[in-house]
């Protein structure tokens, strides 16, 4: 494309504007800004010189337009974005010149094949060099947060933008990520609500429909920004924002424009959810210009008397993926992409998705085994149970080689006491040695089962007692930063030497598994206790409890036949609590929907806590709650429970991806 004999010249933006308008604006529907036009003029002047009107120059603009559109950069071409696109194009062309002798035609074809965005249509595939053959192993990956692509919601363009990896070990939060943490959550949920038909602005097709609407006093569920309630005393509104507290310990609601004090004395909550500070909620009520405890010029005065409060409803995975343009949130296409640059957007096109779904339905023998929480390797009773389980798996592998699990996931904490430093240096060394010996014992057990060692991957997910965070958190979850990094290799090196290369997976918490078309999220946290401790108790809740206690007192604990509703199915308290937990997490679209004083978040990896779009499977590993399986908005959520309770019974779960089926199993030892 680049003519080596052409001498650079100095063009003015006005010279290139007609060509840029014809190609970028008229043909591709893009608008180039002034700074970008100047940058493009300089690039064309340097690359093509007196041949700036040639077909090669126009092809250069064509390629820029293709990449810009396929990267979803919006309709406005700005300077910084154009600079990045030109650099990527130049780097690619340089590699092609060295391998293909600089042929202009070959360069153009290569550019089309190696666009930074993989979004092939069905008619111009192949996807993986073979149109009708896919290797399932290419689409089975265990993904830690530092390997997961980072997409950030752009409130101006109303879409997700890819944030390139810095390839740096980000140990601590930076200022920007801390500031953007709640902003990102707000804008992402706000965008979800804008697609929900229950919160759409009214549309009228005729004057008669407007008159009919006014005559019937039809009310809409349009969400109002907090700044727009000022001066509208006594009016009814629906607001959306972050629920938190101010300096006076009063509840406030905050959105992107302002915050306002809430009066919750008459509030009725939507049943089936927890309501904690740090969650984004929808409130309905009446604004009063008086009555607020905070009265200064910097905030909206008065208070908002809430009548109803609820969560923003979750959106099904298929709809979210479609609205976000089928982005590759798991990076499964990265290894199959011809471009070596990791810092670019990838997509999972519909044709590939259909092939993956069809393929996974044929792999009926594939399964994942997830053990219960708190796999204390310093407990001899638990080691006996693990030995019994591994023996059972080994026997099944000998009887039927096709019935092998793809991965066995062990959930921490892997020690019953947190690994902490002590005043004595000798004791401190002893603590780490004891912790390392726990995994050495696991290696000794595994060495007796050669089929498991050779054929099955082992994944480790840390808990609150595992290093290195346990050294300062002392096993307390409120001081344990999330996401939690994997267990250091110094403790698992013997286990790593035993297993074939790549078969030991040192996972983070949370951890993601991509199985063909499915996204599986695993998190170890005793989260239901956090919800219960921080759940807001409304005045109406107390009144209902008092009425219930009074009724029980009057009836002397007797149940009358008239009180039994035979039409409604009986739901156990455990399932009610499980549904409440699942609905809260999925509606919030975040694994840790709390304020930072409840849970410390490493905001550099906050995107790994986002569950929007909803995952296919969410596996909670809460040792304080029994096992359950609940489906909400197409997302299946389970809890594995505790690995070993008071009896000699080891609990684990088998998941069969082909049918999305779980089997809760137990081994007695």
From Swiss-Prot:
Gene coding for it: DPB2
Gene source species: Debaryomyces hansenii (strain ATCC 36239 / CBS 767 / BCRC 21394 / JCM 1990 / NBRC 0083 / IGC 2968) (Yeast)
Spans annotated as Disordered: 96-115
Additional observations: In eukaryotes there are five DNA polymerases: alpha, beta, gamma, delta, and epsilon which are responsible for different reactions of DNA synthesis.
One GO MF term attached to the UniProt entry: single-stranded DNA binding
Gene Ontology terms: biological process: DNA-templated DNA replication maintenance of fidelity; error-prone translesion synthesis
Family the entry assigns: Belongs to the DNA polymerase epsilon subunit B family.
Name this protein carries in UniProt: DNA polymerase epsilon subunit B
Keywords: DNA replication, DNA-binding, Nucleus
């Amino acid at each position: 494309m680049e003519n080596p004999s052409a001498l650079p010249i100095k063009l003015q933006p006005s010279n290139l504007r007609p060509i840029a308008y014809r190609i970028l604006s008229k043909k591709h529907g893009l608008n180039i800004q002034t700074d970008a036009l100047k940058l493009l003029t300089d690039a064309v002047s340097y690359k093509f010189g007196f041949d700036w009107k040639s077909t090669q120059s126009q092809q250069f603009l064509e390629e820029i337009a293709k990449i810009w559109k396929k990267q979803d950069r919006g309709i406005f071409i700005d300077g910084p974005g154009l600079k990045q696109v030109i650099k990527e194009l130049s780097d690619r062309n340089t590699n092609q010149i060295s391998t293909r002798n600089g042929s202009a035609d070959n360069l153009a074809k290569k550019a089309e094949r190696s666009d930074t965005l993989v979004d092939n249509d069905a008619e111009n595939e192949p996807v993986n060099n073979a149109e009708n053959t896919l290797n399932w192993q290419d689409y089975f990956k265990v993904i830690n947060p530092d390997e997961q692509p980072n997409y950030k919601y752009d409130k101006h363009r109303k879409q997700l933008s890819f944030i390139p990896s810095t390839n740096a070990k980000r140990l601590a939060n930076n200022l920007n990520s801390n500031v953007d943490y709640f902003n990102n959550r707000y804008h992402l949920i706000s965008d979800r609500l804008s697609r929900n038909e229950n919160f759409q602005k009214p549309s009228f097709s005729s004057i008669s429909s407007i008159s009919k609407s006014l005559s019937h006093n039809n009310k809409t569920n349009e969400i109002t920004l907090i700044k727009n309630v000022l001066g509208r005393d006594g009016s009814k509104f629906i607001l959306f924002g972050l629920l938190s507290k101010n300096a006076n310990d009063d509840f406030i609601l905050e959105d992107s424009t302002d915050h306002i004090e809430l009066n919750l004395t008459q509030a009725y909550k939507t049943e089936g959810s927890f309501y904690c500070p740090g969650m984004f909620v929808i409130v309905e009520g009446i604004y009063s210009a008086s009555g607020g405890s905070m009265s200064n010029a910097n905030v909206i005065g008065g208070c908002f008397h809430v009548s109803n409060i609820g969560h923003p409803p979750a959106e099904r995975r298929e709809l979210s993926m479609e609205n976000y343009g089928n982005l590759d949130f798991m990076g499964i296409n990265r290894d199959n992409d011809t471009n070596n640059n990791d810092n670019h957007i990838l997509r999972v096109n519909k044709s590939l998705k259909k092939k993956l779904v069809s393929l996974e339905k044929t792999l009926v023998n594939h399964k994942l085994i997830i053990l219960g929480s708190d796999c204390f390797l310093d407990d001899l009773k638990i080691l006996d149970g693990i030995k019994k389980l591994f023996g059972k798996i080994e026997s099944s592998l000998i009887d039927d080689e096709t019935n092998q699990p793809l991965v066995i996931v062990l959930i921490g904490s892997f020690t019953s006491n947190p690994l902490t430093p002590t005043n004595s240096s000798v004791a401190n060394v002893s603590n780490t040695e004891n912790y390392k010996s726990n995994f050495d014992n696991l290696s000794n057990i595994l060495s007796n089962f050669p089929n498991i060692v050779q054929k099955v991957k082992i994944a480790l997910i840390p808990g609150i007692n595992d290093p290195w965070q346990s050294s300062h958190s002392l096993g307390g979850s409120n001081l344990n930063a999330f996401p939690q990094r994997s267990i250091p290799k110094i403790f698992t090196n013997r286990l790593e030497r035993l297993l074939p290369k790549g078969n030991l997976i040192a996972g983070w918490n949370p951890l993601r598994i991509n199985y063909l078309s499915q996204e599986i999220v695993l998190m170890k946290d005793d989260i239901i206790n956090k919800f219960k401790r921080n759940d807001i108790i409304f005045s109406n809740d107390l009144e209902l409890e008092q009425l219930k206690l009074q009724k029980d007192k009057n009836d002397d604990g007797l149940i009358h036949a008239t009180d039994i509703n035979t039409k409604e199915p009986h739901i156990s308290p455990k399932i009610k609590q499980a549904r409440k937990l699942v609905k809260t997490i999925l509606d919030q679209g975040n694994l840790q929907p709390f304020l930072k004083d409840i849970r410390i978040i490493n905001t550099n990896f906050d995107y790994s806590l986002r569950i929007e779009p909803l995952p296919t499977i969410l596996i909670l590993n809460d040792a304080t709650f029994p096992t359950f399986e609940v489906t909400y908005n197409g997302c299946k959520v389970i809890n594995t429970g505790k690995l070993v309770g008071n009896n000699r019974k080891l609990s684990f779960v088998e998941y069969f991806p082909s049918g999305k089926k779980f089997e809760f199993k137990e081994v007695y030892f």
